[in-house]
Amino acid sequence: MQTGVSRRRFVQSAGTALAAAASFSRAGAWGRSNPTAAEVVELIKKKLAVEGVIWGPSAFDGFHLGDPNTPVIGVATTFESTFDVLKRALAAKKNFVITHESTFWDGFDPVEVMLHDPVCQAKIRFAEENHMAVWRIHDHWHRRKPDPIFAGLARKLEWTSYYSLDTRPRHYEIPEMSLEEVARHIQSKLGTRNVVVVGDPGLRVKTIGDCAHILSSVLPALRACDVALVGETPEYATFEYLRDAMALGMKKGVVMISHEALEEWGMETCAEWLKPIVPEIPVEWIPTGDPFQVPPIRG
């Protein structure tokens, strides 16, 4: 997939309109020149390099929307740059959005196949009219040690002291509790009802593997731990594997939360990490929120 080409085409298409906005508060609210989005990104790359993360090629990371030369009056970090997040960022006077996930829904943001879609057009137009830029940091953010996405989840779960950062698979060693109690703890700490459990609710749990998405990531956690905690995984693979394992007498479980609930908190960390890098610019974390709801059963 020609992701690099599509992004260049997009920036070129948006550049004409956004170039006219170069005067957009360049003096800023403080009567001084503000850095551009591209300049902020260079500061981020330098900070990452100091931490041992050298910027390299990525199919994901880079500018996805808007003009990199846009003067920045405020920065918002977020899990995913949804239309709602863009509107809230604008209302908060944050015209540079740093997102962990994609802007145009597919992981690779193939803009060229979406340019005629009305939702895509509306999103592009909104950014152009409001002089906003969106930059994605996915791969390089995960490369920090410890991975701030999973460390952020551990903090939110109040399990940081139980979290093993240096071993693989990543896992928690918790005081023993049942699988049902694990799920209820996760619901409570993340503030969401969107928790799916596969396995015996009474299963005794001491170790929980922390993993992402696909079965090949879940398997090491299941083999090494009592339970795998995963954010968004294909049901036809992970759940059915576990059902077969349970049919063979293996005492294992899976707790699934949404992709957002797994990774949101690492972008809250990103906002705090950014503040000393650009002390002259306001930085704020804007939570994306759960994409779906689970209505209660009535009857």
What are these model-derived regions, one by one?
Residues 2-299:
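Hydrophobic structural segments
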